[in-house]
Amino acid sequence: VEKYRLTDAARTVDYQENGVTHKFTLRQIEALRDFSDIKAGTLGGWIEEESNLSHDGDCWIYDHNSAVFAGAVISGNARVTQPCTISHGASLTGECWADRADISHGAAIYDRAMIQMSQVRGECRIFGDARVMHQSQVIAAVGLTEDRDQRLQIYDNATVNGSRIVHQAQIYGRALVNHAFIEHRAAVYEDAILEGNDENNVWVCDCAQIYGQARIVAGNEIDQCPTIRYSSQVFGHALIEGDCVLKHHVHVFDDAVITGGPVQLDDRIKICGQARVTGNVFIENQVTVTDDAVIEAFNGDPLHLRGARIISGNEYITRTPVIGAI
């Protein structure tokens, strides 16, 4: 039984892509019967054709300023509230909710996922109880890496706030991503927390992974943006805060703490145990800092450690050793 009809009211929407303006003619929907919280006669949003909105389930386009067109499909019990634009093959189904969102170009939103005040574009999947909110941008792109088939995914109970998630990134578990830039095939999962702010993002890229109960926290001063790159991993209960850059094959885990001023770690570095690194520190080439060891630079003076070695026990290093000098 049909639950709505296309009214005679029509409007044209312009959609710009690659510098070309495309025009779509839409019709407003009107409910023909009562269902869910909709009463017969209720006017809804605008669609290009009936294939855009299923007659089955309780799915509905609530706002009079919402538009669904160009092969997009709303089905199941999906809800579209506040002004939304759903287009170009996007699909919303299950119990998902789009609220003041722009969703397009093959994005698939399902289960109980929520997209609020955000943009989702490209062939990605957002599902489970995932939430994408507060002016986030999710821009999927495939074919840019060796894994040409991997799709960007945000799922489980992951929450993304005010962040930019692009390419083939994966965010899942109970991960909390605030004011971050996640790109390429980077992954944030389990109970990891990324805490950027209005001044500085947390940047995770390449094939880096943040997981366990790790926390990456941006500072409030200029250039206090933590950057996790290449195949680096941060996990366990590790904390990284401020101007820190992790490059090739860096592992920070257990209860290690790194506080940037700035800190740069590169080439098979392990910071673990209860170790602490702080200040203007550069560590490279197969150095392990573990146990209760502390590497601390004072007054902005640079401290440089390099070459295969293990710093352990209660070692406390505050200046560049002669053997480690540049």
Where are these regions (language model features)?
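Terminal amphipathic alpha-helical/low-complexity segments used for targeting or macromolecular assembly
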Residues: V1-D58, H64, N77, P83, ...
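Glycine-rich active-site/cofactor-binding loop and its immediate structural neighborhood
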Residues: A70
